[in-house]
């Protein structure tokens, strides 16, 4: 079974499973396809984080996170620009992550698919074109004035001077040629081959500090996932510099409350999850590259600390919310195969449309992940050469008796741990099916791109009595539309003890889950 936010990506992944490929091989195909058909949220110029697990007890995490350039510009202001060439401060590691995952699949999962074959769907859609999705059309119209000034953006994403609209056929021949180069010469051609030279020249011409040497130095890290026990399951999340431990901390705090005694979606259910988010996020600003800052993950997730955080929650009153907001968008996709080998992945160019910089003649849109750094020397995320920034991506995977039981993830930057907490409590505490859990009302705490208030954005279909009770508890409410895109786009695959599967993708988007029979 596969799930992704775009039907073409899900169909491509399913085809790999149907011809005997592993879940990892299916996920690589989805990763490359989604990089073509969802260009506003991810692409070759971005990063990705992967969690893999199987029935034999193997679990691992691949962190395809690009590092900052060896030589950085001198910034004079208080912050790094959010768009443009001065936000392109980091390399892009997602293509290298594809190779690392493919190598693992071959070595441990018996994968036999040729790497280049896994990119053929992406190449086809880039050459032949595909109908622009509602999501792409929405975000292009939203950002057209902001991004029009950056190199190559209008030439690629506008049609006769106007943004491509939903349903119009969108072709990317230059990106197709870049993918063909990777398929023919291998993933390292992105970093050390003729394609790398074209990328480096395109970045230099745009004003980015990333050089050919920076590309060549880019490597995916293979690390142990962070872990937390919850209601008989073991939850896996990527370690720092990602916010995966924030998701685990929320769940560890909630474990001290009997959620099963509450009605799912009730004001008290929502209140406890919101307050757990506040407690968990108190340490989130300390998350950074472990090569540059001490990251006491075991202390942050210790039973004593989580219990103290749970005791700090007042079931009858909302605490203040002072946490700064980080924007960003990404895509989640997941897969599991007939052998129970399972993959959970997030892939991103950080903000929607990344930096807005299209790299030379490659058709590659580069990420703006450099904007996640701080210019404050006292910050754990202070910008330094070779450093990886704080990272919002945190795909998840849950184990039952050491075997994959849930594959899950969502887009949404700060909202990712919040969405996942609501999703996991519905799936685990209330035993809801993926379709039901994904459709349930959700919230987003804090500022967003459209609302600068530190309010609790909550989907209006939670019901007026719930809204009234949350207001009585002291939450500053800002109701949003039912199944709002602000509340993220998540996906789930649930694996029952007997091996039967149930999967779905978020009704807030256009994605689908597909099963092989």
Language-model segments: which ranges?
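Noncatalytic scaffold domains of N-terminal-nucleophile
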Residues: 1-11, 15, 21-185, 190-192, ...
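Active-site rim segments in enzyme catalytic domains, especially the processed small/beta chain
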Residues: 24, 36-53, 58-60, 209-212, ...
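Short, well-structured alpha-helical segments that form the helix of a local strand-helix-strand
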Residues: 24-31, 115-127, 198-200, 264-281, ...
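Short beta-strand scaffold segments in enzyme catalytic cores
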Residues: 42, 47-54, 331-336, 395-397, ...
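Short, small/polar residue-rich loop motifs at catalytic or cofactor-binding pockets
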Residues: 222, 327-330, 391-393
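Extended C-terminal regions of large enzymes
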Residues: 237-240, 245, 398-415
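Internal maturation/activation junctions in enzymes
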Residues: 256-349, 361-362, 369
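Extended C-terminal subregions enriched in glycine
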Residues: 339, 387, 420, 429-484
